[in-house]
Amino acid sequence: MPRRPRRNAKTSDKAEDAQTLVAPAANASVSSTVNTTTSPTLAAGNESQQRAGIDPNQAGSAGVGDAAPSSRVDNDGDVITRPTSDSIAAIANATKPAAVINNAQATALVPTSNPHAYRCNVCNAEFPSMSAMTEHLRTSHRDEPSTLLATPVINAAIQAFLQAWDGLRLLAPDVSSEALSKYLDSTVDSSPDLIVEDQGLCTSFMLIDNVPASHLSPELIGFTWFMQMYQMTPPLPEGAVNRIVCMTNWASLGDPSRGIEVRLPPPTDNTVHAYKTVLSQGYVASSQFSPLTFRANTLLMLTQFVLSNLKINKSSTFTSDVTTLTVGRMICSFEARPELLALAYPGRAVLPVNTKNAQFLATAIPDRIGRIDRANLIGGEVSASVECMELCDSLTLYIRENYLMLLRSMHQDPTRIVQIVNECARNLLNSSIPVNLRPSILCPWFASTADLRLQQAIHLVNISSNTAAALPQVEALSSLLRSVTPLVLNPTILTNAITTISESTTQTISPISEILRLLSPTGNDYAAFWKCIASWAYNGLVQTVLSEDAFPDSSQSITHLPSMWKCMLLTLAAPMTSDPHSPVKVFMSLANLLAQPEPIVINVDGMHQTTPASQFSHPGVWPPGFINPAQIPVAQAPLLRAFADHIHANWPQPSDFEYGSAAQGSGNLFIPPNRMVYPWPNAPLPRMTVAATFDSAMSQWISTTIAFFIRVVNAPIMAPTVNDLTRRTITGVLTAMRQVKTMTPFYIQHMCPTELAVLGSITLVPPFQVPFTRLVQNDAITNVLVARVDPTQRGDAAVDIRATHATFSAALPVDPASIVVAMLCGQTPTNLIPSHHYGKAFAPLFTSNAMFTRNQRAVITREALVCARSIVAQCQDDGFNVPRPLAGLRQFDITSAAAAEIWHAVNDAFKTAFDIDGALLDGMGLYGDPRIADISVAYLQYDGRVTREHVPPDQSFIHRALLTTENTFLAEMNLFNVGAGDIFLIQTPTNGNWAPMVPVAHPPFARGGPNVNVVGNHGTLAMRPNGLEPQLIDNAGVPRDIAGDWIYPIDVLQVSVSTFRDYVWPLVVAGRVRVRIEIPHYVYTTHYHQPQTTFTDAQLVETWLAGIDPTGIPPIPFSIPIPQVGACITSRRVYHVFAAQNNNNSLFSTNSSSIATVFGEDAGVSPARWPALVDPNYQFGTNELPNRITLYGSLFRYNFTYPSLSGVMFMRSAE
């Protein structure tokens, strides 16, 4: 395509004369016929291209194929007007000898025809022919048409500037989209593991044969072999001694467990490991437990028990039963674990031999087996729940149903979800609900405002312990902004503007080159602009500040042009930071440069006008002239007075806008709910068009700031050191920068609020903001504070809210040059339709569950905090008013260090159970006192005003389950291998039955009884002379004979065990001393032996005594004869240990494969633990908690589905 003709240029005569007097270039033709008055014609240019064999289409839009570019017409075809001063300078230079002509003047010569060599005006490279130079221009400089009119020095500066900004390609949309996907994926991965389904049995207690059966009749032996041969699982254990053992998830099927198990061995093994989680490491032996920390460890064991059972009973395939008694009943098939079938429905079994198990199973009600009168399919859809009768213990079922209540409280209805998404997306998405959504969906995505506010306070707690943790939140939001914004940064906008400036100067430093050098990003910080915007959403956690390296040297003066440029760049960039002191800092940066000609009063001890500007970072050091510009005399300091007036008049006015959804809750602490504060004025987003604006706050700030520095350049103070030509050049550069058509001001006013509103609704950490205070000294926020303790229970200054944990805030230095380039070089697509763009950009944000992750974490934070605080409070006598079911278990009054250890144990348990990475309650245990843990946040202003918010947690579902578990533990502690009541050490020889854990009579003696002595606090022995036996000193300090009845508190026994072993225990074995050891609760073990052989438990007791020390004791050993199914001749046995009260509730049955027990403990299957199976009067849906754990009952199995957000609603904008 032929190029369009150039317009005829009309120039002044004076300019023509100046051009004719310019000396020719060194490589100009020696011909005397040199045309110096006109440019080559269009025809001549086309002819030259044809000779060179160049297609006109290859020449480019800039006309680089011309034989010689015109020096009087710019790229847009406008006439270049040359100032008279430049013409005079050219005439003067023409009279100089050739030796003094500089390169800048030489390269500005009008090209001559027929040169010997062709020189590139961009890079000064020489070429032998026009075709070679044209090809060079086409390949190397085609994208830089504006540089064809600039000098090589400026061109070199432009090249360096553009190369420095070449890293902007790293922020290209394709890279940012990848970052967006990674962020959303990582956010989903950060969500707590709320859904764990179990298709197995809902039970945490296993029925095991603790002692295998022996001495069975031949018929029973044959039947047992038959069942084993065909791998038939007996419905009930058939050992000689069968016990109920706590073992969570032993019958689970489906999803993996939560990573926490409570698996206690039968009492024949040592179980102390479960009761030494905390306050034991390093000083309690592996075979011991500490009675003084028993409550804390029991609480943690029960917490683990609850957390391991936070599951949903999942429905599975049902099949029709074909057994005789229960034919036609619908039962679960348990295809993956068929051995569970016999255990789940023991009432289906028909045992051929009359045994204890058979007698019990004969009482089973057939209708209490399998599914209860409810179809599994309703209207062609699987029903949401199915009620079944099967093996399930009531405590586990209660915990799981309580957890389901928690999930239901978090459920979001699809209609509400669409409302939330539309409001969070500012109605830029076209979303709807599919009409065929099933009623069985469960979307646990909701968190109340109270939970979100608590989570925000916890974020502040964790960040105040580690300020570096706040910076990744800004980086993440910065990446999201770059992923969705249509604004791109194009530095060539700036270079194209300033290269039209004529630079005729004798200065050694080119002004244009210097400003381009200063505008290069420091440290390749291309994203400083986006970091500033992201920091606005977290201005309570992160504070963007101008980098100290960017400030001019305070020892320089205003006549040092690089320092003046730096001051201007700081001033332009300052409103983009969230630093409340940035206006003062930029004011003082100019005051530093004007310290000698324009002195002002500082009125702060130790600070002067020459103090580096970056040190003015507190309202108390703001100069009075800045606070009130009227205090700066115009005659004495005209520039500083004008600068202060400019800042006060044009500094942007903060605003706010709506974000999020009221239905989603709000985590704002200091800002009204669902509002986001903004440091600039904002306006609604135009839906259809965009256009550059020149009346916005940012446009005004850029224009007035540059206008002020034009005044500085032309001020009388600059005249002695800056010549007129330099001032004109600088004025031209500033004017060009002021007139740049950038889209950034429009973006800040109209588009950025929408982006922040949408992204702030989906980020993992919600916006954490404090108000922007502009320029009012008394309103300036000096600290954001957090207290980890209850304000009503603070006892010393070390935990005072003003003395600790100030976190305003983590400083994030940013490069002002990068910010200024972004302000001046913003660009959007010419055909941009904002509603279409944002509809596509925001759609991926709402296709996953990422936006609800923070809600889920907020709920788990609440649950963990309530449980941790309650557990710590239960380990002391005062503190928070919480229920204390386990107050009877011994526990020393914990210190703050011990409380911190307990707190971390609970925190780790919750993080493991819900698979949470990162911090949960970590910061709460690092400082302060967890015994009075409570959270208050506040911000402190300069005038002393404190805005405080107390954020107490709401009620906790898991804590409710924990309290019920604690109360149940008191009634069923034998199921956890824990005994209650004292123990006796009394010699008891017998040939008969012996049941040490089931005393059949009243205790032999008790404290306060006749002739009962209580040992003193130290168990001190009083030695007597002349062969008399030693005496024990009682609690009244009176020596008493050892023979007799003694009360020994366990702590006294621990500190005097050596005395007891040497002097008291031998008399117990001899039958002369009876001892009652006062120990309210203890871990025990059982030791079974054959009654036909001689036996004594003295050795067991001596081993037990040898393991006692002041730090702990081993489990209490009880010796029990094995129950016999036939007549036997027993031997004499001597026992020394038995319990003061019944501790045999974990005994399920004895010799259940026979009809009776002839000798030893005799226990059949208790109907009290199976009312739902055998009691005709059983009320469905009831249980006997906390008094008894039943092992069979009715439960609901659920067919929930858990869709993603894209499965709940349909978005057309996502296509």
From Swiss-Prot:
Gene Ontology molecular-function annotations: ATP binding; hydrolase activity; RNA helicase activity; zinc ion binding
Q: Which GO terms describe its biological process?
A: 7-methylguanosine mRNA capping
Q: Cross-referenced Gene3D superfamilies, in alphabetical order?
A: Inner capsid protein lambda-1
Among its keywords, does the record have Protease? no
**A single GO cellular-component term on record:** T=2 icosahedral viral capsid
Any idea where this protein resides? Virion
Per UniProt, the C2H2-type Zn-finger stretches lie at 118-141
> Which superkingdom is the protein from?
Viruses
Family, per entry: Belongs to the turreted BTV-fold inner capsid family.
Can you name this protein? Inner capsid protein VP3
